[in-house]
Amino acid sequence: MPPHARSGRGPKPQKNGRTEQRQQKRKRDQEDLQQLQQRVDELDLKSDATKKFSELPLSVPTAEGLEIAHFQTLTDVQARAVPLALKGKDILGAAKTGSGKTLAFLIPVLEKLYRAQWTEFDGLGALIISPTRELAAQIFEVLRKVGTKHSFSAGLVIGGKSLKEEAERLDRMNILVCTPGRMLQHFDQTAGFDANNLQILVLDEADRIMDMGFQSAVDALIEHLPRERQTLMFSATQSKKVSDLARLSLKDPEYVSVHEAAVSATPTNLQQHYIVTPLTEKLDTLYGFIKANLKSKIIVFLSSGKQVRFVYESFRHLQPGIPLLHLHGRQKQGARMEITSRFTAAKQTCLFATDVVARGIDFPAVDWVIQADCPEDVDTYIHRVGRTARYESNGRAVLFLDPSEEPGMLKKLELKKIPIQKVNVKEKKKKSIKDQLQSMCFQNPDLKYLGQKAFISYSRSIHLQRDKDVFKFNKLDLDGFAASLGLPGTPQVKFRKGEDIKKIKNAPRQGMSSGSESDEDGEKKTKKKEVRTKYDKMFERTNQDVLSSHYNKLVLDGDDNDDDEEDFLSVKRVLRDDDLDDEAGAYKSTAKIIDGLGGEEPFVVDSKRREKALKSKKKMLKFKGNSTKMVFDDDGNAHAVYELRDEDDFMGEGPAEEQRRKFVEDETSRVREADVDDKALAKQKRREKREKRKAAERAELMGIVSDGEDAPVLHNADDGEDPLALLRSLPMGDGSDSEGDREPPKKRAKKWFEDDSDEENKSKSKSKGKVIRVQEEPETLEDLEALATGLLD
């Protein structure tokens, strides 16, 4: 039997066989890559015969991923953009909403890294930037489906998640889908992370990323990327600005516009209408429209998040008969993702949203897109209505316009080849909800607060719009709009000059105050510090509700003096907060005021608690101020520890060189005097040490045992003491322990016939025979008297 059969091991030639198999597999992979590259090089860009993904020169993992995700037929933008991207060209892609732009850049990303044999050790190879978190999450999900057969590592980097967890995994990622702000934060803060090996950069919704709102973040982001890279830019409204292209370092980009020659810039199967409704009737029209379409899937776009919150809360109380959702940028990321998934899965629901979901988000089967607020430009309109009629499906869109906005907006839409028709609202469909909103605002202060916030945000958004041909702030009925929201009065809105709406819209959330909405021109004047008694505090006391200060800022009551006729009960005087302060200040306080404690404010004794505090040093410390350290000169004058003199006083004492010489002489003499004392002290210590050593040696010769620490020391005869007095006082024993160290004798045990009284009698008898030991023989009369006194006692 051969030896390898006993041990169970195979022959060595099998190991060589496995090595040969690996080499052959590596060789086949190299040949497949060469063939794939050859097919890409031979690809004819002018041919329009490519209709399916199987006809493109794609790798096996990509083809299998497309088949698993059920992608078979190419859209127009994919048929034109993918071949150019496979050849390494920079692309500017423009196509209608819902035309498949996401897949048009994901396939080139996977193929670029696959042909380069990219691994996790090569670092970041592809970067995909999206303007919103929801769109980035959607792109990442499509990437997971299409790239399921690839071995690349991909990550989603958006705000609202743990920065530390992202940083730990970032250096192992090959493909990143991100938002600009979060990615820039990682480039600036994450140690060891760079993009020096980046192969391809993708900008989805590029016109939104390149506008003024993201300009600073994108410019800083581009500085971290290498210049030698492939760049792909896609959007439904593409930018051709030379400055934008130069910022991204594009090299001879190919402009792909599939629907440039189309009759309309929006999908052909999209029905577009607009309704002219005054601002005061906007909510009534919106509520009636929702009530008439309860079996539909609806998206309602509003201009601000505060409007979204107010409309959602008020309609939720009205219960129109359809599930309601709301989505805006102020929500936490988890809530935003949950609402997005719920709306995607629902068949009959209404979503109130801002422009957070206006771009790129693919909501299936949306029936209606309602723009309750006029969009800021035509591009925003195109992206909003693009949430319906996705890829050859039908959809309908409605735009609400104020009579002042109608002429300018229609002219803008006509220039962009957008067909839109006017429709009128049926009278029987109209239903006023003004009284219901007013009742709800009266009963619910929080809803009233949201209404005031919504009014302010809408007024600011209209005032800050650049296109004054469409948005005419002075022609809006703001008083009627406030009444239609259910508010008792028109909130006061103040504006600042030179504001940029896009910069404000895209500003970091940390820079915005969530608790205050005031934009006052100047800071409030600080009142002069005065002595405030408990009566002053009583006059200044106001409502402690959380919204009370907000109401005082917004609502002005009593300013309207238009009515000349007096009512039966007329207001003769309106007390303001300032008037209350004056009344409180005019009150003559009888409180006792104590000055001179050292603090900045005097101490006011206006209660028994204050009088009691006078007796406590701890409580009075805060009224005494901070202590100061003073130094007294030879004349007894107090000076601070560190004093600064001006130049005139310094020069009055003589030239600087003479003062320096005098200072050196004084310090030298002071040091010499101190040196004499130091030498004498050192000499005395040496003498004491020497005498201590001699005394220890002498005691050792005499047989005295010492611990070494308290050795006897012989003093000088000059001290007036007997040098041998210390030696006489020492115990002269036989080397045993001293009496103090001996244990006291044990007490004798009691006999059976003894008790405590016997012990007391015995102690009394002992005390009668007291013996007084005399240390020395009395020599003087005083010694004899002291001895006699002791015997008498």
Curated annotation (Swiss-Prot):
EC number of the protein: 3.6.4.13
- The principal location of this protein is nucleus
Q: Which catalysed reactions does the entry list for this protein?
A: ATP + H2O = ADP + phosphate + H(+)
Q: What molecular functions are annotated in GO for this chain?
A: ATP binding; ATP hydrolysis activity; RNA binding; RNA helicase activity
Keywords attached to this Swiss-Prot or TrEMBL record, sorted alphabetically, are: ATP-binding, Helicase, Hydrolase, Nucleotide-binding, Nucleus, Ribosome biogenesis, RNA-binding, rRNA processing
Keyword Cell membrane in annotation = no
Quaternary state and partners of this protein?
Interacts with the U3 and U14 snoRNAs. Associates with pre-ribosomal complexes.
Q: Which cysteines are joined by disulfide bonds?
A: none
Q: Could you tell me where the Basic residues compositional bias lies?
A: 682-693
- Per the record, what is one GO cellular component? nucleolus
Tell me where the sequence motif DEAD box sits in this chain.
204-207
Q: What does this protein do?
A: ATP-dependent RNA helicase required for ribosome biogenesis. Involved in the release of U14 snoRNA in pre-ribosomal complexes. Required for pre-rRNA cleavage at site A2.
Q: Which organism is it from?
A: Gibberella zeae (strain ATCC MYA-4620 / CBS 123657 / FGSC 9075 / NRRL 31084 / PH-1) (Wheat head blight fungus)
Q: Where is this region: Disordered?
A: 1-33, 497-535, 648-793
- List all Basic and acidic residues biased stretches: 17-31, 657-681, 739-754
Q: Where is this motif: Q motif?
A: 51-79
InterPro entries (alphabetical): DEAD/DEAH_box_helicase_dom, Helicase_ATP-bd, Helicase_C-like, P-loop_NTPase, RNA-helicase_DEAD-box_CS, SPB4-like_CTE
Annotated Helicase C-terminal domain residues: 282-431
Matches recorded under SMART domains:
DEXDc, DUF4217, HELICc
Q: What is known of its domains?
A: The Q motif is unique to and characteristic of the DEAD box family of RNA helicases and controls ATP binding and hydrolysis.
Q: Where does ATP bind?
A: A95, K96, T97, G98, S99, G100, K101, T102
Tell me which domain of life the UniProt entry assigns to the organism this sequence originates from.
Eukaryota
Q: Which Pfam families match?
A: CTE_SPB4, DEAD, Helicase_C
Q: What is the lineage of its organism?
A: Eukaryota, Fungi, Dikarya, Ascomycota, Pezizomycotina
Give the protein's recorded name. ATP-dependent RNA helicase DBP4
